[in-house]
């Protein structure tokens, strides 16, 4: 009797626990609530300059979309593009599988090290690292993908190297040049050459030097051309026509399945893309024997062409480079010189930029705004004693500079480090008012009455003056210009603040949330994340400002 009561009580307890778990336990809704929450980042010791920049760039949806574009085109888990994308998605709480609060950005540091950047364990500038990251990301995005040798298109026989012409090898059975060289004996290599690794492995560190624009140390690499590198695929030694060799008869004793040709000049070089030009006619029996091989080689070349084409890839079978998508921080400044005597205008010179650096006025003053600094940035400059090519007179010329192409994401750097007459460096802590909505129309080349966009890659170049638009020098963000020029209206995404002195301190980031929390603002300092008000954000002494022109704007093609 007692045992039955105990058993019944145990059953009721288990049922109550199960019911509580079903009604109040973890559910999909709670997982969805965790999605989109901002995560902190581990500090490895003086790496706040990296954490603050990752938090700021994680608040830029268009930059993340650009990373996704190239990561989908050529995924490589050890590349900087993939490492950055994974880190930013984990920070935003949007990664499909990874979670972490705080999360370790060690993969980004390892990717930078693999690209040749050595970051000593000391304090660094976040603005310098910003340019380092963009430079490395752009190099990864536009560099040609490592392709195999033309011999990869040859059918192979796993048993021996004889009678390749009569073996029906599948088109998809490609082998790389390096793997073929490693599997053959020394007597089977062309000219008894030693085994050579692939070009991706032959990277020699020649010397160590410092880039003039940054204090971060970079190792300069030298890539050697090997037989499987794109630079040496189409031309080996003088008149050696490797492509025509592929289309000739294969002798049983030939290393790598290549025939030994005594007179390469007698052979015709095939056209890229799987086509070949006319060549001397072979004997009828040999022509029939090689007819099947030629068809397989041609189809293999076309298959390789399809495999190696795509966004961010360069195919050795095509003489046209695919269009590359520039990162969203890339813009262009336009400079033009006007003769004050005859009024002739020079051709517009365009210079690309990833960020703009605004200098503080020599004397500290109150009421300083971002509009004042932008106005000073594009102020015209008088050049004296310049000879005009039009009137041949030596007169004063006026040089004007404006934003010719506005980027999708705008990074503004407020330079706060100055040198004193004594030779010491100090940091200025002036407060610069910056708006949540910024219109760049007063500082750009804007001529609404012109419908023609011809003349330059950035539009018409009749003049670089922004018509008669007033400068946005007030404390407002120029909301009135936003209705006139909506494409030039930017919204604030993140603010990087440096606390401390010129030689030491700490970086923190104020940033927008992700997904449904994009209207909220968060304070991030390494592993610390807390929600703040927009008033607190607009009251901090900004060092780096991140703006964008809207989440749905299409990426610009170069």
Swiss-Prot record:
Reactions catalysed: Thiol-dependent hydrolysis of ester, thioester, amide, peptide and isopeptide bonds formed by the C-terminal Gly of ubiquitin (a 76-residue protein attached to proteins as an intracellular targeting signal)
Principal subcellular localisation of the protein: mitochondrion
Alphabetically ordered keywords of this record: Hydrolase, Membrane, Mitochondrion, Mitochondrion outer membrane, Protease, Thiol protease, Transmembrane, Transmembrane helix, Ubl conjugation pathway
Annotated SUPFAM superfamilies: Cysteine proteinases
Gene Ontology MF annotations: cysteine-type deubiquitinase activity
Active site: 48, 506
Pfam families named in the record: UCH
Effect of gene knockout: RNAi-mediated knockdown rescues the defective mitophagy caused by mutations in parkin and improves mitochondrial integrity in park- or PINK1-deficient flies. Moreover, knockdown in dopaminergic neurons protects flies against paraquat herbicide toxicity in vivo, ameliorating defects in dopamine levels, motor function and organismal survival.
Cellular compartments annotated: Mitochondrion outer membrane
Enzyme class: hydrolase
Highest taxon above the source species: Eukaryota
PROSITE patterns, alphabetized: USP_2, USP_3
Function in brief: Deubiquitinating enzyme that acts as a key inhibitor of mitophagy by counteracting the action of parkin (park).
Name this polypeptide is given: Ubiquitin carboxyl-terminal hydrolase 30 homolog
């Amino acid at each position: 009797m007692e045992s039955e009561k105990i058993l019944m009580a145990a059953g009721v307890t288990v049922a109550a626990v199960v019911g509580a778990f079903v009604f109040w336990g973890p559910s999909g809704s709670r997982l969805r609530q965790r999605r989109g929450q901002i995560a902190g980042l581990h500090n490895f010791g003086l790496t706040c300059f990296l954490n603050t920049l990752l938090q700021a760039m994680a608040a830029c949806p268009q930059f993340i979309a650009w990373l996704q574009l190239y990561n989908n085109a050529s995924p490589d888990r050890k590349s900087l593009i993939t490492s950055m994308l994974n880190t930013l998605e984990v920070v935003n709480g949007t990664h499909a599988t990874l979670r972490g609060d705080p999360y370790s950005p060690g993969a980004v540091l390892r990717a930078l090290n693999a690209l040749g950047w050595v970051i000593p364990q000391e304090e660094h500038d976040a603005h310098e690292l910003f340019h380092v990251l963009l430079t490395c990301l752009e190099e990864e995005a536009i560099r040609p993908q490592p392709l195999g040798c033309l011999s990869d298109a040859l059918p192979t026989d796993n048993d021996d190297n004889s009678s390749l012409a009569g073996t029906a090898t599948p088109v998809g059975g490609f082998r790389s040049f390096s793997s073929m060289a490693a599997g053959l004996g020394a007597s089977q290599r062309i000219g008894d050459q030693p085994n050579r690794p692939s070009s991706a492995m032959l990277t020699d560190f020649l010397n160590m030097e410092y880039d003039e624009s940054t204090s971060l140390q970079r190792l300069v690499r030298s890539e050697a051309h090997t037989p499987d590198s794109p630079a040496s695929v189409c031309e080996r030694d003088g008149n050696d026509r490797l492509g025509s060799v592929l289309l000739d008869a294969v002798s049983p004793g030939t290393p790598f399945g290549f025939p030994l040709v005594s007179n390469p000049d007698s052979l015709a070089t095939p056209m890229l893309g799987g086509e070949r030009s006319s060549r001397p006619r072979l004997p009828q029996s040999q022509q029939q024997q090689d007819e099947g091989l030629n068809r397989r080689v041609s189809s293999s070349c076309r298959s390789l062409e399809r495999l190696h084409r795509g966004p961010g890839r360069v195919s050795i079978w095509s003489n046209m480079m695919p269009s590359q998508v520039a990162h969203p921080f890339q813009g262009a400044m336009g400079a033009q010189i006007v003769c004050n005597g005859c009024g002739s205008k020079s051709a517009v010179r365009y210079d690309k930029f990833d960020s703009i650096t605004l200098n503080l006025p020599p004397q500290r003053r109150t009421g300083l705004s971002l509009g004042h600094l932008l106005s000073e940035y594009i102020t015209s400059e008088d050049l004296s004693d310049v000879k005009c090519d039009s009137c041949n007179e030596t007169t004063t010329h006026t040089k004007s500079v404006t934003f010719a192409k506005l980027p999708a994401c705008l990074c503004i750097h407020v330079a706060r480090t100055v040198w004193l007459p004594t030779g010491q460096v100090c940091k200025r802590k002036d407060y610069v008012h910056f708006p949540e909505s910024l219109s760049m129309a007063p500082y750009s080349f804007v001529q609404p009455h012109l419908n023609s966009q011809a003349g330059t890659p950035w539009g018409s170049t009749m003049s670089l003056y922004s018509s008669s638009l007033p400068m946005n020098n007030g404390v407002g963000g120029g909301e009135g210009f936003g209705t006139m020029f909506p494409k030039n209206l930017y919204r604030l995404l993140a603010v990087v603040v440096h606390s401390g002195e010129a030689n030491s301190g700490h970086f923190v980031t104020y940033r927008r949330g992700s997904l449904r929390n994009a209207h909220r603002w968060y304070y991030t300092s390494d592993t610390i994340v807390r929600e703040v008000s927009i008033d607190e954000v607009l009251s901090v002494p900004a060092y780096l400002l991140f703006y964008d022109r809207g989440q749905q704007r299409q990426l610009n093609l170069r």
